Each structure stands twice: as structure tokens, then as C-alpha cells.
């Protein structure tokens, strides 16, 4: 590929630059070695001051900062950064992806750019693939940063907002891509500034960047709330699906993960349901249930794509083999699988906020990443993220022996050969790591090894609890570890055992922690580490003599990167190692991409099933199949980004407006423009056609009366001579502005002397904006679902989506203005300690008001209903690590409660949808387990408007345009609803 060649053309130049930086660091290393601990720590303050004064940039400080980190790591971890690690750190600081092979110390490399960029005081995010690695790296690498005087935070899924905010206030924050992304979305659902947790997007170092930005990029992050209850149709179609015959009643394309019903199938479904036409408009929703039930039957396999535990369907990550606890497929797919497995069917969801990982990480001012396998995707990194890929040389030459693939005719013959190979290696003491592609196959191989009498460990989605321990011991003499793809990343496999892991385990047993007891931990670390090194030294030599770690792959993955990750477990840091893949013509990759030609050759040559072949034809077929799948997946990711770019522009506008409101911007002038624009829309719409005497001004005045208390009379038909739209508009706009001024005077001022109207404007605009945005997300989802059909009309679906999406966005913005104006004029307001004011009001539902002094939230955005949640938050805040500074909270809002906009406790929690599985099936959802989340669901209820609640003080008063209950025949607003009349009667 031409682009690949162009991208690699500058490798030599950048490597020479990085090598020169490493040499600069080496030249000043002795200067830092001679410093005391206090003097070394004091360098951080000096660096910060030099940056703050603007005398030097971070680039200027790089050699000194890197030298300081190298020395701190030597004193705390007993590890000195190699020159190639210095080069990797510099590549990251310059905004590149550093490709560093397994075992080259990528985690240690991250300390260099993290420290340097933290000196600017804007925060640094270290992004990992799972919570275990985030916690581990925050503890271990955090020792270096804390030694140098920086604060280190870590984000956990169940962390309450006050603690979460404090973690983000640290100089360096560790967490997963999902947590960072969800916090961004939650911040843009917050109702007040003191709920915000993030403080911007300055610099991010993404560990395993290919996994996060490539593998997981097809599926967006989604926060959703409960929608409609599950229907009987899931169960009904789960009953019908087994009655339909594959290739007769429906067709399946496994490569594209699609199903298509045939005419025969349609007839059978119609007979089973007792309907005449499945495709009548009234039956349209049934087609979705049918497709999902067929996908659940054919494309989602138990113990491969998911497992069933305790009556719950749990998704298994395709790339790592881990169980994705709490996550669910969306678009009804998970419910279809639940119906198939005859377990409880849970609720569907409605989107509240969403963003793709591509667009989230493009928010950062500077982005970088690390991985062992990036060059195969260099073009994609460049096109989508504007990131260069820099291959960093290994510290020691790679001496791993990569054996050619062997191919068997059947899967049974392949596994028989695998068992024999493992048994031979185990007998001579060579450790073996076996990679499988599914839980089902790992358990099958485990049974075969047990029959053969080979002791082994199994690491898959059902046995993930001991993952770190199993992998850390996978390099010991004679160890056999059968693992799904989850073994590809995380803990290092060292020959003879991992001394650091052993030392950490010993200190944990002694009750020592680098966070809770840092001084005692540091004092005991070196002794524990040296003891562990001595214990594994002899065993290391025995394993090297046996040939090092042997990596055996039982199947090729559709991505070359996943295969390379498995191979990369062997041969780290110049160790001996060997790798080989055993394949069969029944493997998924071969089966999906035409292995019939190879099978025909083997049949013609009468090759026995237990005799392998090594053929260039097979090698080319595998490479071609993998390239084809990678190309398809790249196109899917590009397509996702193109469509999300439309939403991204709209999301940026909405979120910027929200942030202005939360930051306390004065909305008064903006709301006045809302009033003028809304009135103009009403007037011009009513006067667009015909002569003035033909205008239906009665209807116009009725509409205006529902918007605000109109103070001018509509011109009679006889008085319209010379009347123009502009003249009429000028009169009505002036009247509306006067009414708005009166409304502000009626509300008065708060305890702080500010007009109550300012706080009301903020709350109403925020509530309306959120509700309209949620409705817009639903409509955009609906638009995108069917937009592909435009291609049948010779129209570009993307162009149509962009055009109609823009029109819908404009309509939404006009709707925000109109509804905000209507509510500002008509909603009831209660001031803490006062009676409800008697301004004209719509008959809105009133929820119980929160206690005085509490921040009022919109109906659709309220705290989760948790027992003693406030006390939990306070307790969690008290548990904040001592070195983490408490983030200042903005001042509380005035105690103003807007009736109809008060908080309501949702009946169900939020759901967080994140990537990690095959995007062809739709996203998966993380169920909120009741975490102290800063926001909550209930969007489906909000979209339907205020519901229920106590109507005291509101329902007793008729709507303004309803007939007056006195029987006069006049509208309420012109009779007993007239403020002037009420005041006169009161006198």
C-alpha cells in the first residue's frame, strides 16, 4: 500500500531524533544520581516554576525531566529506564504511537511523558484496557510520581462523584477508556457545576492503543435509561425461530453477521402468528423481533459469544475472552438471547448521551499511545487520529523462533496433535502458553489434556479471577496454561516466574500498600524484590535450557494483530522462545473465507486427517482472509466515524451551550432573543399567505396566549388597512418583552440580591435543552436505521443523513427556544420559605420539593435512588487518599424550586453501553449497579412529559386557555385568571 510506504519513509529521521534525546538524557544522568531524595523531589517545583514563568517549554525541559524520572524509578522500583525506553517516552511526548514489543517495559515508559506533561498543571490521563491494570499501574508507577511530589489518582466504576472529582484533580489520573468517556458524557448531563468531575482534556497516553482505538472503535459509548417494558414478542419469536430451517426459511451470512428471511420463512412466521401480512405497517416492529431471534439462534453461540451464569446472559469479549460483567447488547439483541436461553428478559433502553471513542479521544489537545502491534494499522491511525507510528528498537535482539503454520484437515485431528505437542514440551520442563479463541474450545482442550495426564491451568471467561496469578506463573518450569485471548495483554510472562509479582504478593500478605502505607512499603520493597529474584534465578536457567516459553496458537484470529500479540508473549527482552499455530480447515477463519479449494487438494492427494500440510497456498489463503477482514473492519470504523461526525458537530454545539449555563453565564439577553425569535416564528407563520384582512389572527392570538400573557388586542378585520407583518411583529414583540419584564418583577429577588429570574432562566433552559437533545438523539437513531435504503433510490445515504440531520437539528434548536419561553412565562416557581407565587401558570404536575437549600434538578436528570446515598458519598469522600487534593466545589445555587422540574427518583438505573465485542452485532451495555453516579435515567418518562407526582397548588388552577370554571363562558385567562381581576378581588 502506497500510504504505508509513505508513512514509513520518515522512520529513520524520527528514530535519529529520539536517539539524540536519549543521549542528552544520558549526559546529565550523573547530575541527578548525586542528588538527595529531597533535592530530587525539589526538582519538580523548579520545573513547574520554569514552565509557569514561560521561560521554557515542556520540550526544553524534556532531558532534565526524563533524567529525574529515570533516577526516581531506580530508587523506588529498582528499575532504570533503558535508552530505548527513553526514546519511547520522547515519542509519546511528541504525540506519536510508540510500537514497543512485549516485555520492553511500556508501562514504565509511560512515566516519562506523564511526569513531563503533568508539570503544566493541566492534568494527564493514562488510559488502560481494564480496571485491574489501571489500579495496578496507579499503585506501581504511582510510586515514581509520588516520590517526585506529584499526586496520582485512579478512576473506578463504583466511585462516587466527590471522590471521582478529586481523582481528576490529581496531576496524573489512571483509568479505562470507558470510564473516561462515560465521565465526559455524565459531565454533559450534569445539572449543576458542582456535579462536574473532569477538568479538561489536556494529554492522554493510551496503553494498548490499538485495542482501544481500533478494536473497540466500531461501537459508541452510550448512556441510556429504561424505556418500555419487555414484551411477549421476544418469547414468541424465541418459540418460532427453532421451527424455521436454515437455507430454506432464512439465509445466513456469517462473514457479515447478517440473516435474511425467505418467502417460505415469511409464510411460516405468518402462520405461527396468525396474521395476514408480516410486512404491513402495523406489523413492522415484528420484523425486528424476528431478525434478532434468528441472529440469536445462528450467530450467537453459548460458551463462545456469551455464557449463562445464575440465570443471567453474560457477554464474552471476542478480543480478550473476558466476561463483560453487567454489559448488554443493545437494539433488543440481548433480550432475544435471553428469550432463547429461557432466562429473565430485562428492559430495553433509550439513549440519553452518546459518543464514539474516535471522537472522544480527538477531544484531547495531545494524544499518544503505546502497543506492541501498531504498524499493521499505521494508515488508519494516521487518517483518523493524525497519529504517527514509531517502531522503537528492542533493548536486546529478538531470538524467538517463529515456526511455520501446520494445517490439518479436521479440528479433531488438530487438537490431537496439539495435545501431543504440549505433552512432549511439558515432559522436558518447557513452559507452554496455549491460545484459544473461545471458552468452549479452551474447555475442550482442557478435557483432552486431563485425559492425557498433563497438569495445567485454564484461563478463560469462567475462570478469570486468578488471571494475574496464572499469567505471572505461566513462565515457570513445566507450566501449561490454556487461555483465551485474554492472555495477550497485561501481566508480563517471565521465564522462571515474575519476581516483581512475587514481591508484591508477599508485601500484600504483610498488609503493606504503596498507597495506604507508602513509607513502610518502600522500606520493605528492595528486600522483598531481591528475595524473589533469588528464588526464581535457578528456575529461570532451567527454563532457558528447555527452550524458553513455547506459545502455541490453536487457531488464527481474523486480525493479524491478535496473532502477533499471542506470539509476542514469548521472546521478551532477548529471552529464548518459540511459537507455532496449529490450524484446521474447519476453523472459523478458513470456513468463512473459502477453504474448499484447499480441502479439495487434500482430498485429491488422499492426505490422511492426522497428517498436517505446510503449503504456500494455505499461507496465502490465511493472509488473504485476514487482510480481507481487516479491510472490512476498517471500512466499518470509517463509516461509523463519518456518520458520527454529523452527531459530533451537533453534540459540540449542545455541550458548549450546556457548559456556558453550568459555568454561570448570564442568559438574560439570550432568553430575550428567544422571546423575539419565538414570537417572530408565530407571527410570520400566521401572516405568510393572503392579504391582512384574510389573516387568521384569532388563531394566532390563541397560540400567543398559550405562550405568554398577551397584553395587546388582535386588530379587527376592519382595522387592518395598511397593516404589515413587520408592524404587527413589532407590536407583539414589544408586548412580549414587557410581559417578560413584569414576570421578572413578580418573581422578585433572592437572598443574594440577584433576580430570581436569572436562576429560573438557567434551570429552565438547561432542562429544556436536555429533554430536546434526548428526543433528538432518538430521532437521529431512527433516521440512521433506515437511511441505508436511500441507496436504492440512487441517493448517497451519508449525504441524505447529513442533510436531514441538519434540518432536524435546526428544528430542535427552534423547539428549545419556544419551549424555554413557554415555561419561563408559565411554570410555577416556589422560593424556599415562601408560598407559591400566584402568577398565571400551566396545569403542570408538581413533584415533592427537595429540602431547603438543596439543588433542584430537572425531572429527567436526578440522582440515583440509593439508600443513604448522601451518607455513602460523605463516607467515600472521607476515604479519599491523603495525598489527593480536594477539588473546590462551585457555590450552591439559590434555593429556587421550579414546579414540574424538580428531581424525581427513577425506577431504574442508568445503563452504560461501551465497545468490547464484535461491532457487527451492535453495542453492549454496562448496567449501572447503583453506583454513586452523578446523574440518572428516566429519559423515557421525561420524553413523555411530567408524570404524576403531587399536584397540590397546580391542578386546582385551570389551564390559561381553558373555560373559566365560574361559568361565564370566557377563557380562564380573561376571567378569574386575569391578574388584575384577582388583585381587585383581593382588595
Swiss-Prot record:
Cellular component annotations (GO), alphabetically ordered: cell envelope Sec protein transport complex; cytosol; plasma membrane
Biased composition, class Low complexity, residue ranges: 936-945
Positions annotated to bind ATP: 85, 103-107, 492
Biased composition annotated in UniProt, kind: Pro residues: 882-894
Function noted in UniProt: Part of the Sec protein translocase complex. Interacts with the SecYEG preprotein conducting channel. Has a central role in coupling the hydrolysis of ATP to the transfer of proteins into and across the cell membrane, serving as an ATP-driven molecular motor driving the stepwise translocation of polypeptide chains across the membrane.
Assembly: Monomer and homodimer. Part of the essential Sec protein translocation apparatus which comprises SecA, SecYEG and auxiliary proteins SecDF. Other proteins may also be involved.
Protein name: Protein translocase subunit SecA
Amino acid at each position: 500500500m502506497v500510504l504505508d510506504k509513505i508513512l514509513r519513509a520518515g522512520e529513520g529521521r524520527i528514530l535519529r531524533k529520539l536517539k539524540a534525546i536519549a543521549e542528552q538524557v544520558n549526559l546529565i544522568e550523573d547530575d541527578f544520581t548525586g542528588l538527595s531524595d529531597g533535592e530530587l523531589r525539589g526538582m519538580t517545583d523548579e520545573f513547574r516554576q520554569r514552565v509557569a514563568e514561560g521561560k521554557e517549554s515542556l520540550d526544553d525541559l524534556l532531558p532534565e525531566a526524563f533524567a529525574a524520572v529515570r533516577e526516581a524509578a531506580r530508587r523506588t522500583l529498582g528499575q532504570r529506564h533503558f535508552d530505548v525506553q527513553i526514546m519511547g517516552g520522547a515519542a509519546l511526548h511528541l504525540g506519536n504511537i510508540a510500537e514497543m514489543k512485549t516485555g520492553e517495559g511500556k508501562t514504565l515508559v509511560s512515566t516519562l511523558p506523564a511526569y513531563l506533561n503533568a508539570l503544566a498543571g493541566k492534568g494527564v490521563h493514562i488510559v488502560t484496557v481494564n480496571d485491574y491494570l489501571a489500579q495496578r499501574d496507579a499503585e506501581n508507577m504511582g510510586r515514581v510520581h509520588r516520590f517526585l511530589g506529584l499526586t496520582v489518582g485512579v478512576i473506578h466504576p463504583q466511585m462516587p462523584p466527590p471522590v471521582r472529582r478529586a481523582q481528576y484533580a490529581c496531576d496524573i489520573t489512571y483509568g479505562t477508556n470507558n470510564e473516561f468517556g462515560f465521565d465526559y458524557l455524565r459531565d454533559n448531563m450534569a445539572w449543576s457545576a458542582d456535579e462536574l468531575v473532569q477538568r479538561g482534556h489536556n494529554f492522554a497516553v493510551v496503553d494498548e492503543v490499538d485495542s482501544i482505538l481500533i478494536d473497540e472503535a466500531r461501537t459508541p459509548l452510550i448512556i441510556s435509561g429504561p424505556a418500555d417494558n419487555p414484551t411477549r414478542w421476544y418469547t414468541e419469536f424465541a418459540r418460532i425461530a427453532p421451527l424455521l430451517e436454515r437455507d430454506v426459511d432464512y439465509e445466513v451470512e456469517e462473514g457479515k453477521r447478517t440473516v435474511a428471511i425467505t418467502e417460505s420463512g415469511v409464510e411460516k412466521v405468518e402462520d405461527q402468528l396468525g396474521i395476514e401480512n408480516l410486512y404491513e405497517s402495523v406489523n413492522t416492529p415484528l420484523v425486528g423481533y424476528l431478525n434478532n431471534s434468528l441472529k440469536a439462534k445462528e450467530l450467537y453461540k453459548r460458551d463462545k459469544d456469551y455464557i449463562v451464569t445464575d440465570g443471567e446472559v453474560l457477554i464474552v469479549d471476542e478480543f480478550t475472552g473476558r466476561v463483560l460483567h453487567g454489559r448488554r447488547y443493545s437494539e433488543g439483541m440481548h433480550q432475544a438471547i435471553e428469550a432463547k436461553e429461557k432466562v429473565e428478559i430485562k428492559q430495553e433502553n433509550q439513549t440519553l448521551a452518546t459518543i464514539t471513542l474516535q471522537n472522544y479521544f480527538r477531544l484531547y489537545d495531545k494524544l499518544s499511545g503505546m502497543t506492541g502491534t501498531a504498524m499493521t494499522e499505521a494508515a488508519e491511525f494516521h487518517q483518523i487520529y493524525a497519529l504517527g507510528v514509531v517502531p522503537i528498537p528492542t533493548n536486546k535482539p529478538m531470538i524467538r523462533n517463529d515456526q511455520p503454520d501446520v494445517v490439518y484437515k479436521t479440528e479433531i485431528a488438530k487438537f490431537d496433535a496439539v495435545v501431543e505437542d504440549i505433552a512432549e514440551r511439558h515432559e522436558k520442563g518447557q513452559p507452554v502458553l496455549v491460545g484459544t479463541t473461545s471458552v468452549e474450545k479452551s474447555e475442550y482442550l482442557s478435557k483432552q489434556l486431563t485425559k492425557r495426564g498433563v497438569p495445567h491451568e485454564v484461563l478463560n471467561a469462567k475462570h478469570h479471577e486468578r488471571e494475574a496469578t496464572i499469567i505471572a506463573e505461566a513462565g515457570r518450569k513445566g507450566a501449561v496454561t490454556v487461555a483465551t485471548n485474554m492472555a495477550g495483554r497485561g501481566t508480563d510472562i517471565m521465564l522462571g516466574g515474575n519476581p516483581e509479582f512475587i514481591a508484591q504478593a508477599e508485601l500484600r500478605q504483610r498488609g503493606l500498600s504503596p498507597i495506604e502505607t507508602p513509607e513502610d512499603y518502600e522500606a520493605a520493597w528492595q528486600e522483598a524484590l531481591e528475595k524473589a529474584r533469588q528464588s526464581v534465578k535457578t528456575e529461570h536457567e532451567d527454563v532457558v535450557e528447555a527452550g524458553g516459553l513455547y506459545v502455541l496458537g490453536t487457531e488464527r484470529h481474523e486480525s493479524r494483530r491478535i496473532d502477533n500479540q499471542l506470539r509476542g508473549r514469548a521472546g521478551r527482552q532477548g529471552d529464548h522462545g518459540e511459537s507455532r499455530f496449529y490450524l484446521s480447515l474447519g476453523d472459523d477463519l478458513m470456513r468463512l473465507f473459502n477453504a474448499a479449494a484447499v480441502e479439495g487438494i487434500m482430498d485429491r492427494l488422499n492426505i490422511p486427517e492426522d497428517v498436517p500440510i505446510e503449503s504456500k497456498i494455505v499461507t496465502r489463503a490465511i493472509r488473504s482472509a485476514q487482510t480481507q477482514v481487516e479491510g472490512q473492519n476498517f471500512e466499518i470504523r470509517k463509516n461509523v466515524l463519518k456518520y458520527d461526525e454529523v452527531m459530533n458537530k451537533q453534540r459540540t454545539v449542545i455541550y458548549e451551550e450546556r457548559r456556558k449555563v453550568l459555568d454561570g453565564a448570564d442568559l438574560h439577553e439570550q432568553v430575550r432573543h428567544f422571546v423575539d425569535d419565538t414570537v417572530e416564528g408565530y407571527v410570520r407563520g400566521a401572516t405568510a399567505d393572503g392579504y391582512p384582512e384574510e389573516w387568521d389572527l384569532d388563531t394566532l392570538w390563541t397560540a400567543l396566549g398559550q405562550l405568554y400573557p398577551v397584553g395587546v388586542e388582535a386588530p379587527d378585520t376592519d382595522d387592518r388597512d395598511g397593516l404589515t407583518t413587520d408592524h404587527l411583529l413589532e407590536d407583539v414583540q414589544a408586548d412580549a418583552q414587557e410581559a417578560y419584564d413584569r414576570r421578572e418583577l413578580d418573581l422578585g429577588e433572592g437572598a443574594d440580591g440577584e433576580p430570581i429570574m436569572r436562576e429560573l432562566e438557567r434551570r429552565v433552559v438547561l432542562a429544556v435543552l436536555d429533554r430536546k437533545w434526548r428526543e433528538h438523539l432518538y430521532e437521529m437513531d431512527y433516521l440512521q436505521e433506515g437511511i441505508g435504503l436511500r441507496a436504492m433510490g440512487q441517493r448517497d445515504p451519508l449525504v441524505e443523513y447529513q442533510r436531514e440531520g441538519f434540518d432536524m437539528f435546526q428544528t430542535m434548536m427552534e423547539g428549545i427556544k419556544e419551549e424555554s419561553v413557554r415555561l419561563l412565562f408559565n411554570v410555577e416557581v416556589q422560593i424556599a420559605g415562601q408560598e407559591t407565587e400566584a402568577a398565571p401558570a400551566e396545569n403542570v404536575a408538581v413533584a415533592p420539593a427537595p429540602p431547603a437549600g438543596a439543588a433542584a434538578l430537572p425531572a429527567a436528570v436526578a440522582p440515583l435512588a440509593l439508600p443513604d446515598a448522601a451518607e455513602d458519598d460523605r463516607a467515600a469522600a472521607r476515604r479519599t487518599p491523603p495525598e489527593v487534593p480536594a477539588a473546590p466545589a462551585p457555590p450552591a445555587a439559590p434555593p429556587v424550586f421550579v414546579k414540574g422540574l424538580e428531581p424525581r427518583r427513577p425506577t431504574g438505573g442508568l445503563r452504560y453501553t461501551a465497545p468490547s465485542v464484535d461491532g457487527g452485532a451492535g453495542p453492549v451495555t454496562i448496567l449501572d449497579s447503583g453506583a454513586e453516579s452523578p446523574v440518572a435515567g428516566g429519559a423515557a418518562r421525561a420524553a413523555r412529559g411530567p408524570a404524576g407526582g403531587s399536584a397540590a397548588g397546580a391542578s386546582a388552577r385551570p389551564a390559561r386557555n381553558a373555560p373559566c370554571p365560574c361559568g361565564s363562558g370566557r377563557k380562564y385567562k380573561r376571567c378569574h385568571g386575569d391578574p388584575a381581576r384577582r388583585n381587585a378581588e383581593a382588595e
